[in-house]
Amino acid sequence: MPELPEVETVKRAIASIASGKKITDIFVGRKNLRWPIPTSLNKTLKGVICKQPQRRGKYILIPLSIKQILLIHLGMSGAFRIYKSRPNFQKHDHVAIGFESEEWLVFSDPRRFGCVDLFKEEYVLSHWLLKNLGPEPLSKEFTPDYIITKTASKTCSIKTFLLDQRNIAGIGNIYASEALFRAGISPKRQART
């Protein structure tokens, strides 16, 4: 599963094609991934301009000129491909966006654990997928005091604690394992110790 650094890289690639561009065409290959894809996607996005993409944990957020946000999570196997012109869509291409530049951004997810959502930007802090995310590892809120306070009463393993997105947003199995190895901490150790 892509983790925070990989999702940041994907976000930057999306920005290179989408930022400031008008959407002229939409392709929705299936009606659901992990959850249903909004049925309004096709109708709502045509003619809309994408603003600068953002990232929160493992989520990519694309603000739109209509004061809505397109939210994307890559899941286990999700990826984006960029084309210079309309491609022939493949079996696992679930959502594709065509721009006025004739370029296309195609979201493919063979395992279908990813998600695509569309919501009003005023709900960004209360969206059900975002509202309970903890601070990111490089944010100002992520301090030694934060970790001490959050782990004080946790009886779960430290690795389970690190993987819980409510505690720290963006960390996955690879970075949790690597951090614990480098720190010389057993992943099975209780978080509070």
Provide a role label for each language-model segment.
Residues L70-A169, Y175-A176, L180-R182:
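Phosphate/anion-contacting hairpin/loop surfaces
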Residues M1-G114:
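A cross-family signal for N-terminal binding/gating loops and helix N-caps
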Residues K22-L41, Q54, Y59, S65, ...:
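Basic, nucleic-acid-binding surfaces and adjacent catalytic neighborhoods in DNA/RNA-processing proteins
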